Amino acid sequence: MADKKAPATGWPVANGEYVVGNPESCVAVVTLGSHGLDEAAIEAGAAISGPCHTENLGIEKVIVNYISNPNIRFMVVTGSEVQGHITGQCFKALYENGIGDDGGIIGAKGAIPFMENVGQEPVARFQNQIVELIDMIDSEDKGKIQQTVKDCISKDPGAFEEDAMVIDLEGKAGGAGEEEGSSVKITSPEMAIIESRMRIISKQIEQAAIVNKYNSGYYNGKIQGVAIGLFLSLLIYSMLLI
């Protein structure tokens, strides 16, 4: 039987919208923008399962709950992708690449994928503790989710070698809800889409300005060249007349 460790006192330590199962289970499930899948995951043996809508504080809460339970070694990301936030892809990017010095998730495509309250050390702990992230993004098949959870349990490597890491996210964030208490706040997927598109438009405007500047310089150069040529032609013609 795989070795187990005690999770942090009062686990899960970060509040949110989730269902808790056996804290000694090696599997945790994120159901992204879907609802009605969590009970199925718990019935299959998951330690915790719940949705996650935002690519900043929402992800932080998931990370904090995972690293405070060293028994969690597998992460299943399933359910419908959250438009604008693209939370599922952000989870994958975080697991594969970590965060930069500015707290940004490297390679994430969400609107504002920044870790305000979780630094590089907790992220590294998350990357080391989770042995596999199973990508089931956009799947809402309860049967497949349950089978995936069971497959992970059959490969349980035992608890992570280090004890639970506790991050006081509530104290830092100062809020209670998933999307409250952080200086980075997305009010809706629609706003995230707008902000993402605004950034794309801004880049396109910059590129257009560069092209326009080049074309303007090229055009001005042609005018100057014609003027100089005409002047020299008139000068030579005048000299010939003399």
Swiss-Prot record:
One of its GO terms (biological process) is one-carbon metabolic process. One of its GO terms (cellular component) is plasma membrane. Its cofactor is 5-hydroxybenzimidazolylcob(I)amide. It is found in: Cell membrane. Signal peptide: none annotated. It catalyses: 5-methyl-5,6,7,8-tetrahydromethanopterin + coenzyme M + 2 Na(+)(in) = 5,6,7,8-tetrahydromethanopterin + methyl-coenzyme M + 2 Na(+)(out). 5-hydroxybenzimidazolylcob(I)amide binds at residue 85. InterPro entries: MeTrfase_MtrA/MtxA, MtrA. It is an enzyme of class 7 (translocase). Binds 1 5-hydroxybenzimidazolylcobamide group. Keywords: Cell membrane, Cobalt, Membrane, Methanogenesis, Methyltransferase, One-carbon metabolism, Transferase, Translocase, Transmembrane, Transmembrane helix. It holds the Pfam family MtrA. Pathway: One-carbon metabolism; methanogenesis from CO(2); methyl-coenzyme M from 5,10-methylene-5,6,7,8-tetrahydromethanopterin: step 2/2. The keyword Protease does not apply. It is a single-pass membrane protein. The chain crosses the membrane at residues 222-242. Residues 1-221 are cytoplasmic. NCBIfam families: mtrA, PRK00964.1-4. Belongs to the MtrA family. This is Tetrahydromethanopterin S-methyltransferase subunit A. It comes from Methanococcus voltae (strain ATCC BAA-1334 / A3). The lineage of its organism: Archaea, Methanobacteriati, Methanobacteriota, Methanomada group, Methanococci.
